């Protein structure tokens, strides 16, 4: 098989200072596309037609897997041949196909965070950081039409796609208790489109 993959990525970031606060923001976009080409898979629908004897008409190419397809061959009806020979290129072309499977994934991610000093205590400044992040991921797979229809000798496959989004916020505190001793605390809230909300603290 042959696989052709294209990958794209865009990343942007910004860092600045507003008053005494450090602010940063970012945006990331990424996409992956691939096409998988597989040669030599059998078209089971055409095989049935080719082996159907007198019912193989029109564009159908008759096939006798037991031989009798050489230059001296003669079709005598009811799926029977006389003569010698082997399967011809025309027969192979009729009962095989070139499969094209496609897949794609895309991700979008953006957010910001702010950090600075919230207050001054005898032991030092109280540090704080908070921020927000959004991420969306989606993807899909599209098998070849013959494979999706169950007309292939390869593994069966069906089209599939899906996506999820998540929004997250966080808050972190660093509180000086004494010289060289800090008390830290943090909490993160996440809201997933796939299964709901979670809150984690430490």
Q: Predicted segment positions?
A:
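A structural preference for long, well-packed, hydrophobic secondary-structure segments
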Residues: 156-162, 182, 197-200
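Secondary-structure transition/capping motifs at alpha-helix termini
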Residues: 121-122, 148-153, 175-183, 196
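Surface-exposed, low-complexity loop segments enriched in small/polar and acidic residues
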Residues: 1-167
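Transmembrane beta-strand segments that form the barrel wall of outer-membrane beta-barrel proteins
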Residues: 181-192, 201
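Feature captures outer-membrane beta-barrel proteins of Gram-negative bacteria and organelles
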Residues: 47, 169-171, 175, 199-202
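Beta-strand-rich binding-surface signature
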Residues: 127, 168-170, 182-184
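Residue-level signature of outer-membrane beta-barrel architecture
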Residues: 16-18, 116-120, 171, 175, ...
């Amino acid at each position: 098989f042959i696989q052709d993959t294209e990958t794209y990525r865009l990343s942007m970031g910004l860092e600045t200072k507003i008053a005494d606060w450090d602010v940063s923001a970012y945006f990331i976009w990424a996409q992956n596309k691939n096409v998988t080409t597989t040669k030599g898979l059998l078209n089971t629908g055409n095989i049935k037609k080719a082996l159907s004897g007198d019912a193989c008409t029109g564009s159908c190419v008759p096939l006798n897997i037991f031989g009798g397809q050489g230059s001296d061959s003669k079709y005598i009806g009811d799926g029977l041949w006389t003569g010698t020979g082997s399967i011809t290129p025309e027969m192979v072309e009729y009962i095989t196909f070139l499969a094209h499977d496609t897949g794609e994934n895309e991700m979008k991610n953006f957010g910001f965070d702010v950090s600075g000093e919230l207050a001054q205590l005898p032991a030092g400044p109280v540090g704080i950081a908070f921020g927000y992040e959004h991420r969306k991921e989606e993807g899909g797979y599209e098998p070849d039409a013959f494979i999706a229809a169950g007309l292939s000798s390869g593994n069966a496959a069906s089209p599939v796609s899906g996506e999820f989004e998540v929004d997250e916020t966080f808050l972190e505190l660093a509180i000086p208790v004494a010289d060289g001793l800090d008390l830290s605390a943090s909490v993160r809230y996440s809201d997933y489109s796939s299964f709901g909300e979670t809150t984690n603290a430490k």
